[in-house]
UniProtKB/Swiss-Prot annotation:
Function recorded in the entry: Methylates ribosomal protein L11.
Organism annotation: Deinococcus geothermalis (strain DSM 11300 / CIP 105573 / AG-3a)
PANTHER family assigned: ELECTRON TRANSFER FLAVOPROTEIN BETA SUBUNIT LYSINE METHYLTRANSFERASE (PTHR43648:SF1)
One GO process term, biological-process aspect: methylation
Presence of the UniProt keyword tRNA-binding in the record: no
Cellular component terms (Gene Ontology): cytoplasm
Name of the gene: prmA
Name assigned to this protein: Ribosomal protein L11 methyltransferase
Length: 279
């Protein structure tokens, strides 16, 4: 069995995980401060993940071990689970089924859980035009988990956008697994501010909620676009922020006129919520 040992944890090397999947990894797990990436054959890896080493190890059922370590993740009114744990969702919770795979976002990372909790705290079903359900924009959608969570929580329409084309079919498949019709959740490759992300003919010219699980420097860059895509007073949910980077995010939101800025901390990670300018 061919295993690539990469120093670090799934948290500290979060930005590199998609590089391993794209290089052909068939599974990832973390043991003792080392990420173990399983491959069928040795392959050339990008520079960002070249600080590890290849090892031949005795065969084992790593997939069974990987499944054994995954547990349901409760986030507000939603419980995120892989397909084989769906029956473990508690009564009264909304099951959100995500197949672990190439796109980041299975709910086990604090940033994903914080964002779903923030969505759960909003009354999405009563927002939007005439109270028919919020219009939600998920920036950097990955597996689609946040857009799907929004739909499960009552959003009338959710759009998940990502610059990585690999994620889009995965997100669509996850929406289908969860029984969310394409009329309520869509996924598209695109960049906020560079591509049209509204559907005026369908009443989606702005959004009631924008949620983005990115990183602080991108939030700083996109703060103006967040404001432009939100209705006056709309809800902004930002995560993927290291606590040491919070001043950068606060400064960006202040610059763009956001109000009611609040933060939630979980270890080294932070979530920031705010309200868009009223005009």
């Amino acid at each position: 069995m061919l295993v690539y040992h990469l120093p670090g944890t799934l948290d500290t090397r979060e930005a590199d995980l998609d590089l391993l999947w794209a290089a052909g990894a068939t599974g990832l797990e973390e043991r003792g401060g080392v990420i173990r990436a399983y491959f069928d054959t040795r392959t050339e890896l990008p520079p960002q993940v070249s600080d590890g080493e290849w090892r031949e190890e005795a065969d084992q059922d790593w997939l069974a071990e990987f499944k054994r370590t995954l547990r349901p993740v409760r986030a507000g009114r939603v419980t995120i689970v892989p397909p084989w744990l769906r029956e473990e969702v508690e009564a009264g919770q909304l099951p959100l089924v995500i197949e672990p795979g190439m796109a980041f976002g299975t709910g086990h990372h604090a940033t994903t859980r914080l964002a779903v909790e923030a969505l759960s705290a909003l009354n999405l079903a009563t927002l939007g035009p005439r109270g028919t359900g919020a219009r939600v924009l998920d920036v950097g959608t990955g597996s689609g988990v946040l857009a799907i969570a929004a739909a499960l929580l009552g959003a009338g329409f959710a759009l998940g956008v990502d610059i990585d084309p690999i994620t889009i079919p995965i997100a669509r498949e996850n929406a289908q697994i969860n029984g969310i019709p394409a009329s309520r959740v869509r996924f598209a490759e695109g960049t906020l501010g560079a591509d049209p992300l509204t559907f005026p003919d369908e009443g989606v010219d702005t959004y009631d909620v924008v949620v983005a699980n990115l990183y602080a420097e991108l939030h700083d860059l996109l703060a103006g676009e967040y404001a432009a895509h939100l209705v006056p007073g709309g809800a902004l949910i930002l995560t993927g922020i290291l606590t040491v980077k919070l001043p950068l995010v606060h400064a960006a939101l202040d610059r763009e006129g956001f109000t009611n800025v609040q933060e939630t901390l979980d270890g080294e990670w932070a979530l920031v919520t705010a309200r868009a300018p009223l005009g």
